[in-house]
């Protein structure tokens, strides 16, 4: 599952967040597929983890969170290296089931103590998970990122080639496609 997009939402007085409808459809379809395979009962389950660096919450689909946990189990790192991370991440992670209205419940602990979100939030798709930011913080972060790194909006194929932006320092050393001197 790939999550994309930016959605402005509100966390209600009962700490419920409505999952954006197109993402809800993806999560429901995945839960139904897993139910038909006998892997679950069809309930949409997500795992909510804090990201104190950004003051955001990360929302992981159940299957992806299980994959991440399995990767930790299979990590070549020693138990002494992995265990402190596990002792922090897993206790601070909350399991949440999506209700019939497409909402998940967020804990007071996450909202008030770990990331301090108010009711106006931005839900953003970040490839394999969602993030929930304060709306103002997300917009400020986006503006700052685009001002400092405009090359992030390059075509995905260009980004995958890891080529420097034609306007970036050092790019003049290398002929650019279409440049008559590149023959």
Model-flagged regions — what are they?
Residues 1-9, 13, 23-101, 108-183:
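Flexible "stalk/tail and boundary" regions
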């Amino acid at each position: 599952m790939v999550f994309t997009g930016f959605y402005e939402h509100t966390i209600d007085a009962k700490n419920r967040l409505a999952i954006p409808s197109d993402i809800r459809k993806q999560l429901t379809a995945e839960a139904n597929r897993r139910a038909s395979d006998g892997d679950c009962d069809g309930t949409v389950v997500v795992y909510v983890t804090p990201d104190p660096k950004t003051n955001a919450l990360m929302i992981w689909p159940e299957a992806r969170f299980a994959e991440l946990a399995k990767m930790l189990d299979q990590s070549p790192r020693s138990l002494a290296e992995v265990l402190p991370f596990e002792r922090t991440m897993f206790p601070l992670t909350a399991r949440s089931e999506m209700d019939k209205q497409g909402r998940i419940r967020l804990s007071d602990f996450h909202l008030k103590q770990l990331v301090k979100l108010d009711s106006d939030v931005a839900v953003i798709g970040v490839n394999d998970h969602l993030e929930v930011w304060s709306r103002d913080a997300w917009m400020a972060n986006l503006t700052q990122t685009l001002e400092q790194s405009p090359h992030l909006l390059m075509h995905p194929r260009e980004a995958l080639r890891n080529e420097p932006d034609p306007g970036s320092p050092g790019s003049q050393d290398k002929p650019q496609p279409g440049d008559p001197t590149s023959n």
